[in-house]
Amino acid sequence: MPVFKGSCVAIVTPFTENGVNFDKLGELIEWHIKEGTDAILICGTTGEASTMTDEEQKEAIKFTVEKVAKRIPVIAGTGSNNTAHAIELSEYAQSVGADALLVITPYYNKTTQKGLVAHFTEIARHVDIPIIIYNVPSRTSLNMLPETYLEVKKKAENVVGVKEASGDISQIAEIARIMGKSFEIYSGNDDQVIPIMSLGGLGVISVTANIIPAKIHEMTTAYLNGDIEKARDMQLELNPLNKALFIETNPIPVKTAMNLMGFGVGPLRLPLVEMSEKNLEYLKSVLRQYGLLKEEN
């Protein structure tokens, strides 16, 4: 069985000035389950994991697992450019009941493809739950090549798939060809969900689902149920919104949008800062077009 099919929200982390707002996080989790979200990723890029302490990350993972209470899968972001640190977070996530892990390729230290094999194999050796690799070269300055997944899989059976955010459809097609249907491919880009699903992808780990979870669930479910035309039409309809949510570095626009829409998810953490006035006005105009923001806002 795959970790999930359909829409997994890369959920934002609500903050107060003093820490994680667990009351608000709990509200968001309940809302996502009600809206049909198929899985929740906690402590991903969109959740600002890079500016959370280890203690905050662990508390957020534990809280999410307990709040969800097995109603849908919980995927914990446990990646690091320090293999030992990734192992520590991964072991913790498994110990509190996470269903799977999302582990980003190492960033900044720019290892080789051989190093990627060693990194993921070593993490996988310390846990039993499924691991989804996260390939996002625009953030890491490192691209995991299709043949490297095969080398990892030979040594680590619990590496089950990839969140592919390279934007390179040819590369994703090659991963699908080399790895076969048992290897789970998830879109890491909201504007490429249906193209990737057409190559055998099972869904998306989504930023946009933070504000329209029911729509992203509906789109992916349509494709999975064979209604290709509906899924395609929804992808095209939503792409201007997807674009607006990446007009500045993620998660600046999506968190701003959520606050504009009344979700009250609190501030960004430095070094992320508020949007420029020009981009803010553009975001507002797009949200209004989709009926997500009242005209007076």
Swiss-Prot record:
UniProt key word Lipoprotein: no
Site description Part of a proton relay during catalysis, residues in chain: 45, 108
Q: Which GO terms describe its molecular function?
A: 4-hydroxy-tetrahydrodipicolinate synthase activity
**PROSITE patterns registered for this protein in UniProt:** DHDPS_1, DHDPS_2
Q: Which reaction does it catalyse?
A: L-aspartate 4-semialdehyde + pyruvate = (2S,4S)-4-hydroxy-2,3,4,5-tetrahydrodipicolinate + H2O + H(+)
Assembly, per entry: Homotetramer; dimer of dimers.
Q: What does this protein do?
A: Catalyzes the condensation of (S)-aspartate-beta-semialdehyde [(S)-ASA] and pyruvate to 4-hydroxy-tetrahydrodipicolinate (HTPA).
This chain belongs to which protein, by name? 4-hydroxy-tetrahydrodipicolinate synthase
